[in-house]
């Protein structure tokens, strides 16, 4: 009997640890989830700095969206294409603090650089994810992201 309880307890521990790994995260209401992250499209237009500040106020660890895989890009492009009437939206890549060093507003580095560096902030097209630099003082819709 003791062995049965021990084995049953062991299986319960394994089940609980596995169920909490990837499937255990959830996003707040009106946020979409993808690969342990939560995303939300905001239709109101703001400058890059105001949009980043707004994102940080939405949830702990939230910033303008950063991209780290083509699958993530596809997920966000689909979201923005469906919900935004505008063609462009802010993304978190910028070189505001260091002209020679592009980074995402969450502090991570872009894995690739496929844009012309005319301005310090980046926008993405809603239908094909082409990145373009834009004056940070322009106003666009935006997407916020945080790790669940």
Curated annotation (Swiss-Prot):
This is Snaclec convulxin subunit beta. GO terms for cellular component: extracellular region. It comes from the Eukaryota. It comes from Crotalus durissus terrificus. Pfam families: Lectin_C. Residues 34-148 form the C-type lectin domain. Its main location: secreted. Negative results: does not act by binding to GPIb. The keyword Secreted applies.
């Amino acid at each position: 009997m003791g062995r049965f309880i021990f084995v049953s307890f062991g299986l319960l521990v394994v089940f609980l640890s596995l169920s909490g790994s990837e499937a255990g995260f959830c996003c707040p209401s009106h946020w979409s989830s993808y690969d342990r992250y939560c995303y939300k499209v905001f239709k109101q237009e703001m400058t890059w700095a105001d949009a980043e500040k707004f994102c940080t106020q939405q949830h702990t660890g939230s910033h303008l969206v950063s991209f780290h895989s083509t699958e993530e890009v596809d997920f966000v492009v689909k979201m923005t294409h469906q919900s935004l009437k505008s063609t462009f939206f802010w993304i978190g890549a910028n070189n505001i603090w260091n002209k020679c060093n592009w980074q995402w507003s969450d502090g991570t580095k872009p894995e690739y650089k496929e844009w012309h560096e005319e301005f310090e902030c980046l926008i993405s097209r809603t239908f094909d994810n082409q990145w373009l630099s834009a004056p940070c003082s322009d106003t666009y819709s935006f997407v916020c992201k945080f790790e669940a």
